[in-house]
Amino acid sequence: MVRAFQTFKVETLDIPIPQSEEEFHSLKSMGRQGFQAIFTLDLGKDPNFIFRLRDLQESIRIPWIIWFVDDPEGYGFPESCDPEWTIAFCWDREITQEVSLKPSGKENPLIHLPLASDPEVFFAEEIPSILLFPGGVFVGSTAQTNEILEKAIRTTPGFFEDLEPLWGLYRTDLKRSPQTIAWMYLMEKTGLRLDGIQADPLCRLWVHAAVHLLGIWKRRELVSRLIGQGGGIFGDTEWAHTIGALYQGQITYGEELRRVYNHSAFVLDIRQPQARTGLTQRIFDASACSRPVLTEYSPELEILFEPEDELSFFANSEQALELKKNLLRHPEESNRKAMHAKNKVLSHHTYQHRAKQILQVLKQR
């Protein structure tokens, strides 16, 4: 994003989120140094910074632009931010709409801003005659680490037994919201009204933990079924226990990842549970490399792409297996769709496009 802002001749200063008192004091002085805004991706991992954010905003008194690429609730948004000095974006459309319906969200609204790609890093290379991964590739972790949810899963009696029927519902139709499935189950189990249990912090924790586990099961099942002989899986070492020899180790984001994408028959995309409808980085980066993308369905596909002409999407593993066969049987058609997706990314979904959108909103303040 620094490079993207600089293409619009915006002077930028790249600094870390403050931790020491000296760093907090230095940041407070920025408003007097002529800076027009502060930009951050999420709000870091330090709860002390999030706790002090409102005070910082009131001291600096310049717009604070936040682009959430993770669930804003985990950062205490919108209560953690001063609405007078906050311009907040979110990569996920469903989360954006949900937060905006809350009373506090109306005071401090979110703006939907999808992820994008950097065409200076991800671009199509000459396709070799022999691909390194003719069976496709998946790049991603087995699960996003969350100690609170993992502890809830381990210590809640009967949790796995409760989740088995929910998994049976979810795995047959990935268009269904796992959050909705979990809330409906909990409402039926407790016999209480939905608004009542949604106000209960323990019920919210149970639903978050349920969605977390459903997401883990979804990713492991789909990856193990769809990436087979000739394929490769990159990510954390837990994959080695799940898929064995197909595990290729960890990979660095950037040039190394671009090379893997360009040497793969297709790129598999499966969202983490914190992304309800938000499209992942994989879709934009793999498309920028002009490689076929096989992804789970999201309504955002129909907003940001022409799904039938640019991507292949599925709602369950059986559909995904059939689409995979078609991708490999008809490479010319697959590559044609990938080229269309590449053109869409370059014309609408680069970080320069996102920087331009952010600057336009800032200008209107």
What are these regions (language model features)?
Residues E79-P83, F123-P134, L327-H330:
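Short, surface-exposed amphipathic charged segments that create phosphate/polyanion-binding patches used
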Residues M1-I17, C81-D82, R93, E98-S100, ...:
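Catalytic binding pocket for nucleotide-activated donors in carbohydrate/polymer assembly enzymes
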Residues G34, I60, E84, I127-L132, ...:
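Residue-level preference for short coil/turn positions at secondary-structure junctions
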Residues I66-F68, C90, G140, G235, ...:
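Short beta-strand/turn micro-motifs composed of small residues
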